């Protein structure tokens, strides 16, 4: 914190607001839970009171709102419903990583959760993530109120689609 600054912060981008949250709750022996600690919820609640109703929110965080379990079912992370109730009324885009796979979940017309495949591939071991996505990142633009995005692989141009090996 002394070197990098706070782990929870926000800034305006035009009328919209980017909120950066720490949603990893560390326990003992390197164990952690994915979710929102009480102080994180309090931060967002205090911030939301200051925002114009017309502001769209972009919440950048490590873990997505939904966690994929080993049996391939999904469950929301700890206190996700509390956070969703705080930001209710704003168009909200959650942008996360953590899983090294691409996954989009649309909760409603106003809430989208985008989990982006990692720029490091599968933990720096390969050029691909575990779902086959090449390592890369997303680029977001907003023009005339319309949000658009595309994925940009690290070693290819933005129009790159796939490679087939036979």
Where are these regions (language model features)?
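Extended active-site neighborhood of metal-dependent phosphoesterases/phosphodiesterases
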Residues: 1-55, 72-95, 104-142
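A short, hydrophobic/aromatic-rich structural module that often spans a beta strand
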Residues: 67-76, 113, 160-165
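Short, well-ordered beta-to-alpha junction loops that form the rim of enzyme active sites
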Residues: 23, 60-64, 98-99, 152-153
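Proline-rich low-complexity regions
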Residues: 3-5, 64, 164-166
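Short, well-ordered alpha-helical microsegments
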Residues: 66, 102-103
């Amino acid at each position: 914190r002394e070197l990098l600054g706070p782990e929870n912060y926000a800034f305006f981008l035009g009328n919209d607001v980017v909120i950066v949250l720490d949603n990893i709750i560390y326990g003992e022996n390197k164990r952690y839970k994915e979710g929102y600690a009480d102080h994180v919820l309090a931060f967002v609640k205090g911030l939301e009171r200051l925002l114009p109703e017309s502001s769209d929110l972009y919440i950048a965080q490590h873990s997505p709102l939904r966690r994929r379990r080993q049996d391939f079912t999904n469950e929301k992370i700890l206190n996700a419903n509390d956070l969703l109730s705080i930001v209710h009324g704003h168009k909200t885009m959650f942008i996360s990583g953590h899983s090294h796979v691409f996954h989009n979940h649309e909760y409603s017309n106003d809430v989208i959760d985008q989990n982006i495949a990692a720029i490091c591939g599968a933990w720096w071991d390969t050029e691909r993530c575990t779902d086959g996505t090449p390592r890369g990142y997303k680029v977001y633009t907003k023009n005339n109120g319309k949000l658009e995005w595309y994925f940009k692989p690290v070693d290819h141009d933005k129009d790159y689609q796939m490679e087939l090996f036979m």
